Amino acid sequence: MFYKNSQAVKFSIPGGTNGLIFPSSPKGDQTMAVVEMDGVYPETGYSLNDFCTETIYLLEGSLLAEVGGQEYNLTPGDLLVILPGNRYRITGRGKSVDLITPAWDKAQNHILS
């Protein structure tokens, strides 16, 4: 499979998160995104996925991730895996490649206060 950059859809999330999300694989088993962040996600509270795993590979910058009550300082080359059912919050400035498995489904993501 091959996707051109022009096939990706731009997105913006309040709090300073922007990026490109590529089409999900035909089998629906994964979605890939390139994410640039300068702020906090989510803007308030925490995010939680019911069934998607988010794998974040940091390309540049630095991020502080709070996942399931643990804190992780990410620097370029670090990989963070956020399993379903873990509330999380990410702050900082950086650029990452994010792999979401199975394919992204916004309905399974919740913002908790």
Outline where the language-model segments fall.
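A short, N-terminal "cap"/entry segment at the start of jelly-roll beta-barrel domains
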Residues: 1-31, 43-46, 112-113
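Double-stranded beta-helix
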Residues: 2-3, 28-31, 40, 91-113
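A short, sequence-level motif marking secondary-structure junctions
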Residues: 8-9, 26, 37-38, 78-81
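A generic structural signal for short beta-strands and their flanking turns/coil linkers
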Residues: 28-33, 54, 61, 84
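Short, conserved beta-strand element in jelly-roll/cupin
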Residues: 36, 48-65
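A short, compositionally biased micro-patch
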Residues: 51, 58, 75, 83, ...
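Short beta-strand His + acidic residue motifs that chelate non-heme Fe in jelly-roll/DSBH
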Residues: 65-66, 82, 87-93, 98
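Short acidic-glycine-tyrosine-enriched beta hairpin
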Residues: 69-85
